[in-house]
Design a protein with these regions (language model features):
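N-terminal phosphate/diphosphate-binding loop that engages ATP/GTP or pyrophosphate donors
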Residues: 1-5
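Switch II of P-loop NTPase G domains
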Residues: 20-32
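Switch II (G3) loop of P-loop NTPases
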Residues: 10-22
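A generic alpha-to-beta junction signature in SAM-dependent methyltransferases
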Residues: 6-7, 32, 67
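Acidic, Mg2+-coordinating active-site environments of NTP-dependent enzymes
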Residues: 35-133
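Short acidic/histidine-rich motifs immediately flanking catalytic phosphotransfer sites
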Residues: 8-11, 70
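Helical "lid/switch" subdomain of P-loop NTPase nucleotide-binding domains
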Residues: 6, 21-24, 60-63
């Protein structure tokens, strides 16, 4: 686990928290105690141990329960579970930042993505500022 590679003096770490069943994200994020979380989408990738997308959404929402108070969660506004996840976050006093490829009013709007064999270029709008990566 990459968490064991984090040194005491490190100011931040980017950690992926995976899951195969309900409770796994909760257990891992109790250890990590994140300031910031990202849920990219709710999809059938984890369906083998769940009965529905609702179950997957509930399991992924476990990260929100362990974000420090006043922390942040970044959510995909294009996902059908956006409002479900946002509601949980707001109840926990977690700031929600949205991203979208469809809704130009989201906090982070993905205007265009260009890919080829050697690189990827992403054009995003954050508030009124357009950036290219």
């Amino acid at each position: 686990m990459s968490l064991f590679n984090v040194k005491k003096n490190d100011k931040f770490a980017v950690l992926e928290v995976g899951m195969d069943k309900a409770g796994e994200i909760n257990n891992l994020t109790q250890i990590i105690k994140p300031n910031l979380g990202v849920i990219t989408n709710i999809s059938y990738a984890h369906i083998k141990n769940f009965k529905s997308l609702d179950g997957i959404a509930r399991a992924k929402s476990e990260i929100i329960n362990n974000i420090v108070e006043g922390g942040k969660i970044i959510l995909n506004q294009d996902d059908e579970y956006f409002n479900f996840l946002k509601k949980i976050a707001l109840k926990k006093n977690i700031h929600v930042t949205s991203f979208s490829k469809k809704n130009s009013l989201s906090d982070i709007f993905i205007k265009k993505i260009i890919t080829n064999k050697t690189n990827c270029k992403i054009f995003i709008k954050i508030k009124n500022l357009t950036k290219t990566f």
